[in-house]
Amino acid sequence: MVKLNQLRKDNPLIICITNDVVKNFTANGLLALGASPAMATERQEMDEFLAHAGALLINIGSIEEGDKENMLQAAAFANKHHVPIVLDPVACGASKFRKDFCLRLLNEHHISIIRGNASELAALTDDATMKGTDADQSLSTESVARRAYDKFKTAIIATGAVDAICQDEQIMLVENGTPMLTKVTGGGCLLGAVVASFIYNETKPSLALLTEAIATYTIAAERAAHSANGTLPGHFAVNLIDQLYLIQQDDIAKESRVKEV
């Protein structure tokens, strides 16, 4: 686990096409971590942005019909410039509109990572439907990650009480985290952007690298929950930004609770 220091040194440009509700929170989180976010969406400038980018996040949280072509064009330019893409299929099990778009994106372009909760990933693999953006807590992140990897043959991050990461048919579980992440909007969306920041310039990131990304974020979240007034949602959100700024490489090795299965 050695990428955090390099990330802060390189300050990679991360293009975030993301949920309108979380743009400010996401940008501040990446700045605190050490990345350089750009919340660009205009297709006329996307080729120029992605020529210099380290990664692209596509988050469909507030997708509308007019957003589809922008996202597809951005994915095409990212593939052209060998820029890794993280797809966050927010609430893709809640409507055919969302699910069909995600499947089209996955079919037409190379996506390096799919990051979703268990319900979202189960919906993509035709195993479940969902209500809104909330995860079905009865679903196993490990089994959902395996099924999604088998279907899409790309790295999968299934988030929940225990986060499961699948790459090259290997699974790593990350047990860090806090329920407070479900009490503020954007907790999962920011995680997708953090993952994009860690995998800059890596179109096929290793299991170890993905594990470091998840551990960094979830340890910061644990620390935020234990900071002053961290059990209050408003304070927790601010604390999380602070802890992403404060966390150090050595903290990840000392505090991570991970296991391979």
Curated annotation (Swiss-Prot):
Q: Name one GO molecular function term.
A: hydroxyethylthiazole kinase activity
What top-level class of enzyme does the UniProt entry assign?
A: transferase
Listed A to Z, the keywords are: ATP-binding, Kinase, Magnesium, Metal-binding, Nucleotide-binding, Thiamine biosynthesis, Transferase
The Gene Ontology biological process terms listed for this entry are: thiamine biosynthetic process; thiamine diphosphate biosynthetic process
What is the E.C. number? 2.7.1.50
- Which Pfam family is one of those matched by this entry? HK
* Reactions listed under catalytic activity: 5-(2-hydroxyethyl)-4-methylthiazole + ATP = 4-methyl-5-(2-phosphooxyethyl)-thiazole + ADP + H(+)
Q: Which residues bind ATP?
A: 115, 159
InterPro entries listed in its UniProt record: Hyethyz_kinase, Ribokinase-like
Identify the metabolic or biological route this protein is part of. Answer: Cofactor biosynthesis; thiamine diphosphate biosynthesis; 4-methyl-5-(2-phosphoethyl)-thiazole from 5-(2-hydroxyethyl)-4-methylthiazole: step 1/1
Top-level taxon in the UniProt lineage = Bacteria
The coenzyme or cofactor needed here is: Mg(2+)
Q: Which residues bind substrate?
A: 39, 186
**Which NCBIfam families does the protein's record reference?**
PRK09355.1 (NF006830)
- What is the protein's known function? Catalyzes the phosphorylation of the hydroxyl group of 4-methyl-5-beta-hydroxyethylthiazole (THZ).
HAMAP family, A to Z: Thz_kinase
Q: Which family does it belong to?
A: Belongs to the Thz kinase family.
Please identify the protein, giving its name as recorded: Hydroxyethylthiazole kinase
What's the source species for this entry? Macrococcus caseolyticus (strain JCSC5402)
Recorded name of the encoding gene? thiM
